[in-house]
């Protein structure tokens, strides 16, 4: 459930939100050793989606943008039930990574499967076909730094595994007609936990899709390696649901 008391606490924060404004006790959900998780308003689930993109966890940039959008909408008098969809649309997979992601999805032929012009339209006129989420839904930090999924490995952290089973799995159950595209190896491993437990159908999952971060300089060659396999999987998934 959305922590509205947490979201509304930002109403009175002025200017550009700083780390100290959000990474504080009021917003912290859990802390175990060097691992901390902070509430981030990404609770909206688009149940009409046909494509679900799963990242690792919101980083600081996304966390700040999400709260900034929520704060501004609250100040503008928007009803609570209209705020979360707007936050997800504005802040989900934002920044330079989005351009890389769109090119990679285009290379897999996703627009053709959906009957749209380009993957960019999933963030514009065809946004209702897309849902974005994370293996760890809320912003996770390790040693006060953005958690990148590898140190420590996501599947080895008990707290993170709880998010995968208790938050992500039910979320994916709510979008049964959607293909699931994990962004990178850490999310691959998280989905693997659910597949092995019988909590997720592997036929839905485009395992092996590289992380679109600019730091992954090999992403396009990695896409080329799995292009045929994942393109076929996408075609089979969507054709079976339109027959």
List PLM regions with ranges.
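Extended hydrophobic/aromatic segments used for targeting, binding, or gating
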Residues: 193-222
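Low-complexity, Gly/Ser/Thr/Pro-rich intrinsically disordered linker/tail segments
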Residues: 237-243
């Amino acid at each position: 459930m959305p922590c509205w008391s947490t979201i509304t606490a930002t109403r009175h924060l002025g200017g550009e939100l700083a780390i100290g404004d959000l990474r504080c006790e009021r917003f912290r959900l859990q802390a175990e050793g060097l691992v901390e998780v902070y509430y981030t308003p990404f609770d909206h689930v688009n149940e009409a989606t046909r494509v679900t993109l799963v990242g690792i966890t919101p980083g600081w940039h996304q966390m700040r943008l999400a709260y900034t959008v929520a704060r501004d909408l609250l100040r503008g008098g928007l009803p609570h039930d209209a705020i979360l969809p707007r936050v997800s649309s504005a802040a989900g997979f934002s920044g330079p990574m989005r351009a890389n992601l769109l090119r990679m999805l285009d290379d897999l032929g996703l627009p053709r499967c959906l009957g749209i012009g380009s993957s960019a339209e999933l963030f514009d006129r065809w946004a209702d076909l897309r849902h974005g989420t994370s293996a760890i839904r809320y912003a996770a930090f390790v040693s006060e730094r953005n958690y990148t999924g590898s140190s420590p490995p996501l599947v080895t952290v008990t707290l993170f595994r709880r998010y995968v089973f208790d938050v992500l799995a039910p979320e994916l159950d709510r979008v049964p007609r959607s293909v699931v595209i994990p962004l990178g190896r850490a999310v691959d491993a998280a989905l693997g936990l659910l597949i092995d437990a019988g909590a997720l159908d592997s036929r839905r999952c485009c395992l092996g899709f590289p992380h679109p971060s600019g730091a992954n300089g090999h992403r396009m060659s990695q896409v080329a390696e799995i292009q045929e396999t994942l393109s076929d999987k996408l075609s089979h998934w969507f054709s079976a649901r339109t027959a």
